[in-house]
């Protein structure tokens, strides 16, 4: 009963925050080419654009090794996916996100029986809303009198775009990737910021409170820095921190994306950590595709 009241109050708070942020936004960052969240794990502050349907799909190989008791190794593969659809004045986006993993957990002692595991590590249905865009109704005009002013650092770029996101998590009973008491529906809340700097640099932060109302509430932060070298290639570096009673880690990612067409991107990334309880090494490959029926009338 107490748990149900806690979940209800948390959900009401999230709804209140979203409705308090109903600011009219007429400018957003729809782009002529696809702007995927892959291959990083953070999400952009901006919607994909009104009436734009975007698919993001990746596969990865996972290797984990724990060198202290109970010693074990994990090897397997996984799939992560996301679907985004933009509606209402470019500011609101609906999305579905998830990660499915299949692996074998082998214990070196021989006393504990090896495990074959398969389930969703997470599955979420939610929405994202652009609360503040520093470039709203602003046209960045070149300085006709100063070459250095056009090429130099713009202090206004330090003010980030801000979004809030929320959603429902769905966890099944006896899921090996969650605490044993976690099942059913819980909530997610995310604060997102994004700075677009000159020279093709973008800095994104995500601060997430996940599985709110369950026995495993996760605190998660992700910091992502991307750089476009040319219209085709983008590189990124990312750090992700995870903290809960069930699992804690600090992950690092490096990767690249290649624009194969205006609506199609390929990507790859390497993920690792610096501890041995367990050590983590993942390599991923992915693709992003959008159906662009962008409508500026909404």
Task: Tell me the role of every PLM-derived stretch.
Residues 1-34:
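Bacterial Sec-dependent N-terminal signal peptides
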């Amino acid at each position: 009963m107490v748990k149900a009241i806690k979940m209800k109050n948390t959900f009401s708070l999230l709804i209140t925050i979203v409705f308090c942020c109903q600011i009219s936004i007429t400018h957003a960052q729809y782009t002529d080419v696809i702007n995927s969240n892959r291959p990083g794990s953070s999400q952009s502050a901006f919607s994909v654009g009104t009436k734009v349907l975007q698919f993001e799909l990746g596969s990865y190989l996972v290797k984990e090794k724990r060198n202290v008791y109970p010693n074990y190794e994990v090897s397997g593969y996984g799939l992560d996916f996301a679907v985004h659809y933009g509606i209402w004045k470019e500011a609101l986006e609906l999305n579905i996100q998830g990660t499915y993993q299949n692996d074998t957990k082998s214990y070196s002692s021989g006393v504990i029986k090896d495990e074959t595991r398969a389930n969703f590590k997470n599955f979420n249905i939610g929405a994202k809303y652009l609360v503040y865009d520093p470039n709203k109704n602003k046209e960045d005009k070149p300085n006709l009198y100063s070459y250095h002013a056009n090429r130099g650092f713009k202090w206004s770029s330090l003010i980030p775009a801000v979004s809030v996101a929320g959603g429902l998590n769905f966890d099944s009973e006896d899921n090996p990737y969650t605490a044993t008491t976690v099942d059913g529906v819980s909530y997610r809340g995310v604060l997102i910021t994004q700075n677009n700097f000159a020279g093709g640099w973008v800095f994104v932060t995500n601060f997430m409170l996940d599985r709110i109302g369950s026995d495993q509430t996760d605190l998660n932060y992700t910091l992502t820095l991307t750089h476009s070298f040319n219209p085709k290639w983008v590189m990124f570096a990312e750090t992700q921190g995870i903290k809960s009673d069930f699992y804690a880690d600090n992950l690092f990612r490096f990767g690249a994306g290649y624009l194969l067409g205006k609506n199609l991107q390929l990507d790859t990334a390497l993920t690792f950590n610096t501890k041995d309880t367990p050590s983590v090494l993942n390599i991923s490959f992915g693709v992003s595709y959008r159906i662009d029926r962008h409508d500026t009338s909404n």
